[in-house]
A protein has these predicted regions:
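HAD-like aspartate-dependent phosphatase fold
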Residues: 1-125
């Protein structure tokens, strides 16, 4: 049985738009030896497919289930721990919206609520 590598993205695999030199090759080597590589990030701005595309372009080993963002974790957590929740008001990034929709939530977005952040704006939903 191989090792599970939990690898942060921002600052470890890449810095800004630039890949960290050598990281993709090391991760590919570890995967070829039987280790599992799972990428984690607290950045909820992007959808996991966007991360997968970026990692694949760098030559890093990646598959649909090997990217876990805070958005993905939030959606999965809500679905598992409170299945009665059906409708969610999102005051956040597009990645969070898509992950919640993937889990079957009715996602409501409100520019007014996001910009004013008042109880009245939120109560309207």
């Amino acid at each position: 049985m191989g090792l599970l590598l939990l690898v942060d993205l921002d600052g470890v695999v890449y810095r800004g738009a630039d890949p960290v030199p050598g990281v993709a090759a090391v991760l590919a080597d570890r995967a070829s030896r039987g280790d599992d590589v799972v990428y984690v990030t607290n950045n909820s701005m992007h959808y996991r497919a966007d991360y997968q595309t970026r990692l694949a372009a760098m030559g890093a080993p990646v598959s649909p289930d090997t990217v876990v963002s805070s958005a993905r974790a939030t959606a999965a957590y809500l679905r598992e721990h409170d299945p009665a929740i059906q409708r969610v008001l999102v005051l956040g990034a597009g990645g969070l919206e898509r992950e919640l929709r993937d889990e079957g939530f009715d996602v409501v977005t409100a520019a007014a609520a996001a910009t004013r952040m008042s109880q009245e704006a939120i109560d309207g939903y």
